[in-house]
C-alpha cells in the first residue's frame, strides 16, 4: 500500500526554515503546538504517526525532546551506522525509510507519515510520485536564514481552500504574523 506523504514546515517570506541549527524566528508557542498536534494525532485507534527527518534536524531538537514523543521517529543518514540515541529507526534514504514503513511489523502500527525536515529531505519527498500534502506555516516576515525550503511547484501542487483542523485566519504571536496553508498533489 502506498500511503500519502505529509510534509510539515514553517517558512519565512524569504523561504528560510533554519539558522545555525535552530529556527530563524523567536519560538512561536501556538505554531509549535500546531506542529505537535498535526504530527501526533492519529485517526486510527491503536496506530501511531511516524516522523521522518534528516540527521541535522534530529540533532537540532533539544535532547530532552528527542525522540518526538508519541510518534515513531526515523532518522535519515548515510554516515551513521546505528540509530542515534532515542531514535527508533535509521534509514539511509527516504526511499529506504518508505520501504521500512511497509514491512509488516511497522505497517500495522503506522497511521500517517510526516516529513519534518530538513531541506534535502523535503526536496526528495516533494519529488516523490503519488499523493503528497504540504502543511506550510507562512511566517509573514523575512528572517536571516542559512537553510531554505524548496520552491513549491504550483503546476503540481494545489493550495487547498481549507483543510479539517487547520485554521484559515492569520495568526499572530510575539508581533509575528503567520498563516497555515495546505497544498496537495495527486499523480
UniProtKB/Swiss-Prot annotation:
Entry similarity comment: Belongs to the dihydrofolate reductase family.
PROSITE patterns reported in the protein's UniProt record: DHFR_1, DHFR_2
Range of residues in the leader sequence: none
Function according to Swiss-Prot or TrEMBL: Key enzyme in folate metabolism. Contributes to the de novo mitochondrial thymidylate biosynthesis pathway. Catalyzes an essential reaction for de novo glycine and purine synthesis, and for DNA precursor synthesis. Binds its own mRNA.
GO cellular component terms attached to this protein's record: cytoplasm; cytosol; mitochondrion; nucleus
Name of this chain's protein: Dihydrofolate reductase
Compartments where located: Mitochondrion; Cytoplasm
Keyword RNA-binding on entry: yes
UniProt binding sites for substrate: 31-36, 65, 71
Residue ranges constituting the DHFR domain according to the UniProt record: 4-185
UniProt KW Signal keyword: no
Residues given in the record as NADP(+) binding sites: 10, 16-22, 55-57, 77-79, 117-124
Quaternary structure annotation from Swiss-Prot or TrEMBL: Homodimer.
Entry-linked Gene3D superfamilies: Dihydrofolate Reductase, subunit A
Alphabetical list of Pfam families matching this protein: DHFR_1
Sites bearing N6-succinyllysine, chain numbering: 33
BP GO terms, sorted: regulation of removal of superoxide radicals; response to methotrexate; tetrahydrobiopterin biosynthetic process; tetrahydrofolate biosynthetic process; tetrahydrofolate interconversion; tetrahydrofolate metabolic process
A molecular function (GO) term: oxidoreductase activity, acting on the CH-NH group of donors, NAD or NADP as acceptor
EC number: 1.5.1.3
Entry-annotated residues carrying N6-acetyllysine: 33
Catalytic activities: (6S)-5,6,7,8-tetrahydrofolate + NADP(+) = 7,8-dihydrofolate + NADPH + H(+)
Keyword tags: Acetylation, Cytoplasm, Methotrexate resistance, Mitochondrion, NADP, One-carbon metabolism, Oxidoreductase, RNA-binding
Superkingdom assignment: Eukaryota
Amino acid at each position: 500500500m502506498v500511503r500519502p506523504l505529509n510534509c510539515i514546515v514553517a517558512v519565512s517570506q524569504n523561504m528560510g526554515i533554519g539558522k545555525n541549527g535552530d529556527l530563524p524566528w523567536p519560538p512561536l508557542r501556538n505554531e509549535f503546538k500546531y506542529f505537535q498536534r498535526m504530527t501526533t494525532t492519529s485517526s486510527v485507534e491503536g496506530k501511531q504517526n511516524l516522523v521522518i527527518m534528516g540527521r541535522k534536524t534530529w540533532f537540532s531538537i533539544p535532547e530532552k525532546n528527542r525522540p518526538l514523543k508519541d510518534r515513531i521517529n526515523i532518522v535519515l543518514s548515510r554516515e551513521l551506522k546505528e540509530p542515534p540515541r532515542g531514535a527508533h529507526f535509521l534509514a539511509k534514504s527516504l526511499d529506504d525509510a518508505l520501504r521500512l514503513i511497509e514491512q509488516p511489523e511497522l505497517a500495522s502500527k503506522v497511521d500517517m507519515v510526516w516529513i519534518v525536515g530538513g531541506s534535502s529531505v523535503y526536496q526528495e519527498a516533494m519529488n516523490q510520485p503519488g499523493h503528497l500534502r504540504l502543511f506550510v506555516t507562512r511566517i509573514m516576515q523575512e528572517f536571516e536564514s542559512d537553510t531554505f525550503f524548496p520552491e513549491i511547484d504550483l503546476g503540481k501542487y494545489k493550495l487547498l481552500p481549507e483543510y479539517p483542523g487547520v485554521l484559515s485566519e492569520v495568526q499572530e504571536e510575539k508581533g509575528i504574523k503567520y498563516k497555515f496553508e495546505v497544498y496537495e498533489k495527486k499523480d
